[in-house]
């Protein structure tokens, strides 16, 4: 599981953290300004990414659960004043019912179970204003194709030796890999509800602070960052993402029942 404990209040003037797990963009680049308008920052007891799928709804990783959240939208840089920046509180959160939190796990289970059904919906206390820098992205309608070039994004650490978030939103281009590649690394992963993406040669990855952020393959939102190996970007150790096509019915049901 990849998540990041904040050492600061929401001033965001200085962002340092110590990760109990791992999830950041490594080997990436500064995203083009406003190119990822659905990307949000989710701040609770941990720092995570998230995705705006409706003006009132954000989807993120279940392991990013907190009692309270603040959501930053329209951000490219976490510390600068930006014209499209918005801030929202969260009125309700809904972890997937089949996600098993760490504190409830049977200790005989292997770590890969952390990543199964790892998604959560956040109901914003006030709908986001849709602008040039804040937009929703549609849920997938078809299975992603192995070999697709995918884009992951987030403000997670870019250097595993520095416990510090990136101020600028980072993007990284990686390949969607086969289930077999995932099973080689994570023996008990449930590949029907997860995706594996990365570079088998290493060097490019998501990592600490990126959990819950988007994985967009061939222009379609297909996954949410869940976790991976430590340190990030190791050869032959792709990262794990929640496979959203398997959860669209649950997502729509929760949104409909909680207008």
From Swiss-Prot:
One of its GO terms (biological process) is positive regulation of vasoconstriction. The active site is at residues 63, 118, 211. CDD domains: Tryp_SPc. The keyword Oxidoreductase does not apply. Keywords: Disulfide bond, Glycoprotein, Hydrolase, Protease, Serine protease, Signal, Zymogen. Pfam families: Trypsin (PF00089). One of its GO terms (cellular component) is secretory granule. InterPro entries: Peptidase_S1_PA (IPR009003), Peptidase_S1_PA_chymotrypsin (IPR043504), Peptidase_S1A (IPR001314), Trypsin_dom (IPR001254), TRYPSIN_HIS (IPR018114), TRYPSIN_SER (IPR033116). This is Submandibular glandular kallikrein-9. The lineage of its organism: Eukaryota, Metazoa, Chordata, Craniata, Vertebrata. The gene is Klk9.
